Amino acid sequence: MKIGILVAMSKEMELLKGFISEGQAEHGRVFDYLVGKVGKNDVVIQQCGIGKVNSALGAAEMITLYEPDFVLSTGVAGSLDDDLHSGETIMGVWYHYHDVFCGKELVKGQVQGMPSTFTPLEVGINTEGDLCVRIGKILGHNIRIAGVLSGDQFVVDPKVKARLKATFPLASVVDMESCSIAQTCYRYKVPFVAIRIISDNCEEEQYEDFWKYVEKWSFDKTKKILEELA
C-alpha cells in the first residue's frame, strides 16, 4: 500500500522524518516530498500550506506524481460544538465548503457540477476496505467522527461561528483545507481521510499552550495510524 500524507505544519514534517525508514527528499514542480517506508507500506509526505488552493494543488500534484492508494491529511480545526474541546481528535466523515455560493438552485457550499457534500463513499473509501472504519478502530475512543466545513477563513469570531452553525447545523468543526482535498481526491478517484486536532472553539485566539504540543499530538495520531495499517 502507498499512503500519501498532507501535513499542515513544518514541525510535523520534521517529526515524521525520524519515523520513516529509507527516507529521501524528492521535488515536484511546486512541492517538496519526503518518500520512504513505514513497515511494508510506502509513504509520501508533503507540506502543502494553508488554504483551499494550496491544499488542492498539493493533493493534485501528489496524486499525479506518486499515485497513492489513499490520501491522509493531518492538521488542526476549530470546534463548532460546545462538547468538542481543544486537544480532542476528530476524523472527518463528510466535507463541505462554507464559503461557496453558485446560485440559488444549488445547496449553499456546493460547487456547480460537484456533489453538495463529499463523503467517504464518494471519494472511494468504501472500495478500500472501509478505511474510515479501520482508522476508527485503530484510534478507538481517542477519536470522534465529525462533519467538516472548510473555507478560506480562520474563524475566531463568535458571530461567524454562530452563523456557520445555524447554516450547517450538522457540522462539528471548521478548517481551511479538508474539503478542497476531498474534492481533489473525488476528481481523481482516490480515497481520502482527514484527521484533525481541535485547536480552539472558534471564538477567541488559539490557546498558547495548545500550540506548544499540537505538532506532537498530531504526529502521534499519524504515527499510530501508519503503524497499524502497515
Language-model segments: residues:
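Proline-aspartate-enriched helix->loop->beta-strand connector
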Residues: E67-L72
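N-terminal short beta-loop-beta anion/metal-coordinating cradle
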Residues: M1-Y66
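A C-terminal functional module that forms or caps the active site or interfaces directly
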Residues: F154-E204
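Short, acidic/turn-prone active-site loops that include or flank metal/cofactor-
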Residues: R29-F31, I50, W94-Y97, I197-D200
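Regulatory input/activation interfaces that engage signals or partners
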Residues: F192, I197-A230
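Mid-sequence, gly/pro-rich, charge-dense loop/helix-turn segments that line enzyme active sites
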Residues: L80-F168
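Active-site-proximal beta-strand elements of phosphoester/diester hydrolases
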Residues: V44-C48, G147-L149, I195
